[in-house]
Each structure stands twice: as structure tokens, then as C-alpha cells.
Curated annotation (Swiss-Prot):
SMART domains referenced in this protein's UniProt entry, alphabetically: CPSase_sm_chain
Self-association state and partner proteins as the record states: Composed of two chains; the small (or glutamine) chain promotes the hydrolysis of glutamine to ammonia, which is used by the large (or ammonia) chain to synthesize carbamoyl phosphate. Tetramer of heterodimers (alpha,beta)4.
Protein name per its UniProtKB record: Carbamoyl phosphate synthase small chain
NCBIfam families recorded: CPSaseIIsmall, PRK12838.1
Native source species: Corynebacterium glutamicum (strain ATCC 13032 / DSM 20300 / JCM 1318 / BCRC 11384 / CCUG 27702 / LMG 3730 / NBRC 12168 / NCIMB 10025 / NRRL B-2784 / 534)
Taxonomy, superkingdom: Bacteria
CDD domains per UniProt: GATase1_CPSase
Sequence ranges assigned to domain Glutamine amidotransferase type-1 in this UniProt record: 195-390
Length: 393
């Protein structure tokens, strides 16, 4: 393995620290450590996004996951103060696996390097990996428990490292949204004239979501995961929103019950990603774990109501069971599977035929990613407008 001798101020020389990526099935990859040096454990998943690594790494939906980048070189644009998707700039990925770490930062907005930011936040990374071989393995065998071991930790017997990896908690059955949610309620005010107030449940919300609402004149009250429905009534919301987030939706029973209360109260509802799975469960649908998930910023999705195809940003390892255009009865009226992925037919959106509640599995807030699906926010505002007119507000 060739060694890059470029040095970042205050961090480890690139290529100087041996490291291993160890999978639970015993497969091991040799590389070099960067960022923090030590051990990290998580579920190994891959993203096909060619840009936006900062947005990916600060997305709370990646909590407890080691992210493998398929793009061959990472770090070119450094790190800046504007593109974080977590509220406090926290990196949520458990670790980062790459082929080549850029030796120089080349972006006018950069305030530091990827290497420096990871070291500062204690995030362990490994480079010099044959990521093509690794991604093929994950594609064929599925996402798997993994660990990155660098420095002194990499000197332990591989058999011992494999056992450490195997003994970590599984993603299936994990209720992780409470681990990434805000501790207290906070508010993002509307830009210009305030049209509506939305209560947004933070299950791992990305910061571009309230920005999308704010730009449309919507005041967003962001509440912690599992906040009782009775507690949000004080805000007199025009609508309720459920965000993206990590973990297994089958373990989120409290949030499912809350959404059922929202629907029973006939309050307009919109959900994305984890929120889509929660709405589906409230409708009586089942969820399952995908083999290797959808993670990227160019995933094609078909809207079976309009026939339109959107290119979407996605990050999910679980999905709802259903088929394109499927109609079914719920406690709240007839529902329909509105969207599916053109790559594999996975359910990407559901709605009540009345239009009062809808959700999508992908990320219309587009950070990073295309803006094809941003009209979903306009749709929610129009739904709240119509509801206000009906109620004579």
C-alpha cells in the first residue's frame, strides 16, 4: 500500500497508522487510520452519493452506522460551518470508510479539513480500502455488523476483533430516535408573514427541513421524540410533521400511537423517511429490513398518482411492505401506496386517499441531493391552507 506523506496540522500523518475494517462474517480489510485513532463499532452500509459527505456524516439517521463511500476520493472540499445537517454540527456516523483521503482541501467555504474535524469529534476512519470489493460484498451479502480498529487496537488478534464486532447490539429491534432527538423543544420562525404553525417531531431531523418550512411562511415548533400528543395541543398546530431518523420502525411503538392520535384528531399530517414508516405502521402496515438499503442522492422514484418520476435523496435500511398502487382500508379511511422505487419496487410513499395524511420514504429537503421532490412541502402548506378555510380560520 502506497503511503501519502502529507501532514495536516495537529492530526495524524495520512497513511502512518495501520488500521483494519473487520466484518462480523470474518472478512477483514487492511488500510490506514485517519481522524480519531482507536475503535468504533456499527453497521456497515454504503452510500452511492458522489457529493455531500458533510451532510451525510452529520445526518442523525446514520447513528450507529459505519458509512462506506463509493466515491473514490473523499475530503476534497474540506469541512465548513454551513452544511451541517445536525443542529449542533455533531457528526453522527459511527465511522467512515474510504478509498482515498484528499491530501489538500480545495473549497473557498472550508474552515478545516475532514481529517481535522473527524479527529476533533472523535470519529474513527479508515482509508486505503478497496471500496469496490467491499461494496460488492455488502451488496451481495447485505449490511453487516462491522468495526474499525486503528493504532494499538489494530495490533490485537483478528479473531478477537471479529468477536468484538459480533457482540455489538443489532440494528434490528433498536429504538434509536430517542438517542438522537433534541432534549428540549425549540422553534424555527417563519420567514416573512407567518401562515401556519407546524409541530415537527424530531426523530433525527435534518436542519434543512425546518428551513424548507420557514421559507414557505411556516413556523416550526420542533419537539423531542415521543412527546405526548396532549403536550403539543398547546401550540394549536395547523399540521404535524414526523422527521427522518435512525433505527428499526418496528421498535417505535410510542410514535405509532402518537401518529394515530394525530390522525384521529383529523390534523393534517406529513412524514418523511422514518416518518413514512411510522405512518405506515399507524395504517396497519408491516415493516422489514432491506438487504443493503437505499443510500444515495440519485434514486429514481415513481409517483403512481401523477406518473411523474423524481430523482431523490435517500437514506433508509427499513421499508414498508406493499406494492405500487395498492389500496387498503385503515382506521382512518382508504389508503394507497403512492410511490415506489424504480430500482427495486420498494414502497417510497403512502397516503390517505382523502389527502389528509401522506408521507414519503425519501428526503425532499435535499441536503445533499436534488430538488425534484421539494413541491411536497408546498403540498403540505396547501393542505393546511385548505384545512384552515374549511374550519373558517
Amino acid at each position: 500500500m502506497s503511503k501519502d506523506t502529507t501532514t495536516y496540522q495537529g492530526v495524524t500523518e495520512i497513511g502512518s497508522v495501520p488500521a483494519y475494517l473487520v466484518l462480523a462474517d470474518g472478512r477483514t480489510f487492511t488500510g490506514f487510520g485517519f481522524g480519531a485513532i482507536g475503535t468504533t463499532l456499527g453497521e456497515a452500509v454504503f452510500t452511492t452519493a458522489m457529493t455531500g459527505y458533510q451532510e451525510t456524516m452529520t445526518d442523525p439517521s446514520y447513528h450507529r452506522q459505519i458509512v462506506v463511500a463509493t466515491a473514490p476520493q473523499i475530503g476534497n472540499t474540506g469541512w465548513n460551518d454551513e452544511d451541517n445537517e445536525s443542529r449542533d454540527g455533531k457528526i453522527w456516523v459511527a465511522g467512515l470508510v474510504i478509498r482515498d483521503l484528499a491530501a489538500r482541501v480545495s473549497n473557498w467555504r472550508a474552515t478545516t479539513s475532514l481529517q481535522q474535524e473527524m479527529a476533533g469529534q472523535g470519529i474513527v476512519g479508515i482509508g486505503g480500502i478497496d471500496t469496490r470489493a467491499l461494496v460488492r460484498h455488502l451488496r451481495n451479502e447485505g449490511s453487516i455488523a462491522a468495526g474499525i480498529f486503528s493504532g494499538a487496537d489494530a495490533q490485537r488478534p483478528v479473531e478477537e476483533l471479529v468477536e468484538i464486532v459480533k457482540n455489538q447490539p443489532a440494528m434490528t429491534g433498536a429504538n434509536l430516535s430517542v438517542e438522537v432527538s433534541a432534549d428540549e423543544t425549540y422553534v424555527i420562525e417563519a420567514e416573512g408573514e407567518e401562515r401556519h404553525t407546524v409541530v415537527a417531531y424530531d426523530l433525527g431531523i435534518k436542519q434543512n427541513t425546518p428551513r424548507r418550512f420557514s421559507a414557505r411562511g411556516v413556523r416550526t415548533v420542533i419537539v423531542p421524540a415521543e412527546t405526548p400528543f396532549e403536550d403539543i395541543k398547546q401550540y394549536n398546530p395547523s399540521g404535524v410533521f414526523i422527521s427522518n431518523g435512525p433505527g428499526d420502525p418496528a421498535a417505535a411503538d410510542v410514535m405509532v400511537d402518537i401518529v394515530r392520535e394525530v390522525l384521529e384528531a383529523d390534523i393534517p399530517f406529513f412524514g418523511i423517511c422514518f416518518g413514512n414508516q411510522i405512518l405506515g405502521r399507524a395504517f396497519g402496515m408491516e415493516t422489514y429490513k432491506l438487504k443493503f438499503g437505499h443510500r444515495g442522492i440519485n434514486v429514481p422514484v415513481k409517483n403512481h398518482i401523477t406518473g411523474k418520476i423524481d430523482i431523490t435523496a435517500q437514506n433508509h435500511g427499513f421499508a414498508l411492505k406493499g406494492e405500487a398502487g395498492q389500496e387498503f382500508e385503515t382506521d382512518f379511511g382508504t389508503a394507497i401506496v403512492t410511490h415506489t422505487c424504480l430500482n427495486d419496487g420498494v414502497v417510497e410513499g403512502i397516503a390517505l386517499k382523502s389527502g389528509r395524511a401522506y408521507s414519503v420514504q425519501y428526503h425532499p429537503e435535499a441536503a445533499a441531493g436534488p430538488n425534484d421532490a421539494s413541491p411536497l412541502f408546498d403540498q403540505f402548506v396547501e393542505l393546511m391552507d385548505a384545512d384552515a378555510q374549511k374550519k373558517g380560520a
